[in-house]
């Protein structure tokens, strides 16, 4: 075959003509003269979509790539095999310390048969949410343990990866809600039942090969015989039926329950069937004869689930009474009652390796672990209080026992693995709920920052009448920068006599913290005279009642004076608060023994002046129509009390160190009342704005007055 000729002119140059089609072809063979296969349409569409998303506005920010959690058991299995081969001692196990580097010594549960506590799966790994928003009724691991199969209320099977827990596929298999499905022991068959009573056969690849109507009403549970030739089902028609798998034919119908049968399970090695019903009975059946062997009447409510232990000696039942009951089939007696749930228990699962470990889920979303080897087997050893937001319907352990999967009414399937060597998972939101975890985190931060487990109550100042602050001086969040500023200001004497000053508006720390106050009728302002805040801090008492509100005339008459100072309250440690506002101005006084008249600004108050018998002071002469005052039962203040020297008469002008002035009831209208300044000592009744109350441990001496001078000494 000759090469094609190219037209040329007389000089041999090629004539202009159409372009060479090979010149526009960008493809050239690179190896063995075989062209590369072009991308298919799906790849091109994905590339175009990604380019469009990148060019779109508002998506220029960098996306944070989060790696998916993966639980790989191959490392632990290989480590265990290596130890058995190299050490030559089958029971040799390396010690595991609370250090992240010791995770390499984490062996599978089969290598730690003598320690069931290592197989508690309470560490959250992943939450898988089905594309179809429907409750997850059943969860089961596939026989090869590489995937997890879930069934929901819409009749769909969903496959999840068993290592990375990502979604793989979804298949519509039933027309109604899937209530139960289980794999055969050899892993070659799958039988499922739905709410309509339909039973279907599937291959391991989820291919439907047969289906028939098994019960007239909903079918709730399915269980295989030990040799995989038969399986048993139960339903709301009150019957327990035994079926031949190969013939898809009913062999025997067991009747004896008086209501819906909610659960059934075949013994793992023997010809024995257990069933639980809504009639509160647990029955044991002989599958060969169909007779009722025994009936247990321990439960007082509906039986929701029943499961044989892997060794076949125990059977666990649970229901609406929120407890799990263990029975020994060798005696047909109740062995133990496991408590710890607050709502009805919906599912039970035994650990495949550690047969003394039991896990259960209830209608509140709680998952509890019980150990029969525990000193107190009736109480859970681990509780996941907030494992799900709604009821837990199904639980399933990985065949190796290192992962637990739970299905719930909140449309999710959650995966839990064993705790890692550092620990700390017991303080997360799954164990303590959101509020408990936040409180625990706050305590941890508080302990790290201030060296204490929690912020002491009233650490920065005392309340009314009770003890002041704690002995330990603790900085307050957000106010620690004010300490230097407060220390640089002269704040005057404190209750501790030279102790650290308090923060503005928060009181002063009180080192004399005593017994807590008691609520009795004796007012706190009637403590030991002269003790002030210190005396009340060691045993102060709260006033029980409040005086009656003053009349409108009294309020208008006493409203002209300014209120007392607030700086003294900040230094008043544990003293009682005086009348800081107009509606509290009767708390600082005490009740008149003759009735409802109050010392202070209460209506119908006593004549002015201090009570008799204190520091040599006497009452002024009472009006003719006013009954005499009873003698005081309180001891006088100590002699030479600072700030209160005895006075020979009441004619002294007001000022520092002067006793209160007295006025008769019908005082002259001319001129304002004396000692009305906010810095002086308040009187009873007339001086509504006195700065310091003379009597009581920090109480407001005069109506809306400030805080007691005695409370600061």
Curated annotation (Swiss-Prot):
Region described as Disordered: spans on this chain: 1-37, 448-474, 490-713
Localization per record: Nucleus
One BP term from GO: chromosome segregation
SMART domains, per database record: WD40 (SM00320)
Predominant location: nucleus
A Pfam family reported for this protein in Swiss-Prot or TrEMBL: WD40
GO cellular component: mRNA cleavage and polyadenylation specificity factor complex
Alphabetized UniProt keyword annotations: Chromosome partition, mRNA processing, Nucleus, Repeat, WD repeat
Listed Low complexity bias regions: 534-548
Secretion signal span: none
WD repeats: 131-170, 173-213, 214-253, 256-295, 298-337, 340-380, 387-426
Skewed-composition ranges (Basic and acidic residues): 566-593
Gene3D superfamilies, per the entry: YVTN repeat-like/Quinoprotein amine dehydrogenase
Task of the protein: Required for 3'-end cleavage and polyadenylation of pre-mRNAs. Also involved in chromosome segregation where it has a role in chromosome attachment to the mitotic spindle.
Name of the molecule in the record: Polyadenylation factor subunit 2
Species the sequence originates in: Cryptococcus neoformans var. neoformans serotype D (strain B-3501A) (Filobasidiella neoformans)
Gene designation per UniProt: PFS2
């Amino acid at each position: 075959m000759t090469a094609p000729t190219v037209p040329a002119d007389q000089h041999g140059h090629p004539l202009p003509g159409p372009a060479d089609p090979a010149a526009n072809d960008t493809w050239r063979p690179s190896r063995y003269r075989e062209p590369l296969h072009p991308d298919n349409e799906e790849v091109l569409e994905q590339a175009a979509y990604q380019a469009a998303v990148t060019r779109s506005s508002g998506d220029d920010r960098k996306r944070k790539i989060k790696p998916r959690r993966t639980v790989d058991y191959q490392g632990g299995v290989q480590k265990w095999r290596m130890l058995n081969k190299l050490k030559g001692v089958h029971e040799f196990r390396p010690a595991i310390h609370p250090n992240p580097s010791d995770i390499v010594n984490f062996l599978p549960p089969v290598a730690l048969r003598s320690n069931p506590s290592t197989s508690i799966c309470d560490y959250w790994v992943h939450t898988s949410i089905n594309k179809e928003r429907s409750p997850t009724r059943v969860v089961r691991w596939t026989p090869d343990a590489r995937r997890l199969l879930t069934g929901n209320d819409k009749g769909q099977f969903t496959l999840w990866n068993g290592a990375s827990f990502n979604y793989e596929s979804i298949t519509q298999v039933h027309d109604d809600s899937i209530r139960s499905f289980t794999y055969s022991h050899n892993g070659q068959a799958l039988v499922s039942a739905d709410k309509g009573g339909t039973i279907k056969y599937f291959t391991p690849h989820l291919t439907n090969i047969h289906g028939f109507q098994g019960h007239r009403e909903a079918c709730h549970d399915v269980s295989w015989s030990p040799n995989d030739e038969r399986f048993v089902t139960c339903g709301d028609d009150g019957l327990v039926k035994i079926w031949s798998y190969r013939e898809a034919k009913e062999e025997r119908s067991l009747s004896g329950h008086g209501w819906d049968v909610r659960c059934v399970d075949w013994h793992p090695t023997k010809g024995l069937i257990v069933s639980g019903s809504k009639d509160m009975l647990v029955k044991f059946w002989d599958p060969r004869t169909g007779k009722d062997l025994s009936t247990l009447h321990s439960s007082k409510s509906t039986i929701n689930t029943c499961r044989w232990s892997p060794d076949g000696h125990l059977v666990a039942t649970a229901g609406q009474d929120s407890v799990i009951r263990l029975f020994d089939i060798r005696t047909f007696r109740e062995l133990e009652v496991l408590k710890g749930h607050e709502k009805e228990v919906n599912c039970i699962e035994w650990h495949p390796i550690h047969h003394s470990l039991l896990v259960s889920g209830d209608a509140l979303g709680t998952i509890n672990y019980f150990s029969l080897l525990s000193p107190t087997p009736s109480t859970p050893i681990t509780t996941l209080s907030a494992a799900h937001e709604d009821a837990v319907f199904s639980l399933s352990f990985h065949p190796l026992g290192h992962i637990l999967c739970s299905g719930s009414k909140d449309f999710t399937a959650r995966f839990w693995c064993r705790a890692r060597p550092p620990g700390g998972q017991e303080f997360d939101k799954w164990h303590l709920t959101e509020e408990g975890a936040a409180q625990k985190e706050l305590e941890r931060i508080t302990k790290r920052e201030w060296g204490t487990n929690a912020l002491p109550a009233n650490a920065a100042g005392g309340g009314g009448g009770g003890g002041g602050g704690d002995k330990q001086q603790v900085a307050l969040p957000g106010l620690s920068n004010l300490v230097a500023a407060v220390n640089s200001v002269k704040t005057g004497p404190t209750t501790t006599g030279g102790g650290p000053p308090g923060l503005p508006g928060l009181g002063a720390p009180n080192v004399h913290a005593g017994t807590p106050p008691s609520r009795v009728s004796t007012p706190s302002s009637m403590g030991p005279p002269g003790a002030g805040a210190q005396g009340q801090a060691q045993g102060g008492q709260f006033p029980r009642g409040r005086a009656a509100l003053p009349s409108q005339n009294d309020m208008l008459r006493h409203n002209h004076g300014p209120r007392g100072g607030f700086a003294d309250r900040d230094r008043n440690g544990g003293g009682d608060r005086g009348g800081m506002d107009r509606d509290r101005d009767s708390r600082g006084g005490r009740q008149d023994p003759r009735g409802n008249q109050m010392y202070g600004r209460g209506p119908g108050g006593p004549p002015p002046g201090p009570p008799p018998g204190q520091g040599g002071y006497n009452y002024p002469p009472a009006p003719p129509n006013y009954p005499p005052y009873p003698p005081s039962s309180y001891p006088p203040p100590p002699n030479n009390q600072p700030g209160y020297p005895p006075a020979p008469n009441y004619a002294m002008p007001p000022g520092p160190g002067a006793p209160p002035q007295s006025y008769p009831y019908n005082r002259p209208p001319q001129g304002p009342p004396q000692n009305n300044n906010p810095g002086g000592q308040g009187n009873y009744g007339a001086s509504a704005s006195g700065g310091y109350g003379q009597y009581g441990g920090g109480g407001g001496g005069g109506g809306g007055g400030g805080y007691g001078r005695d409370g600061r000494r």
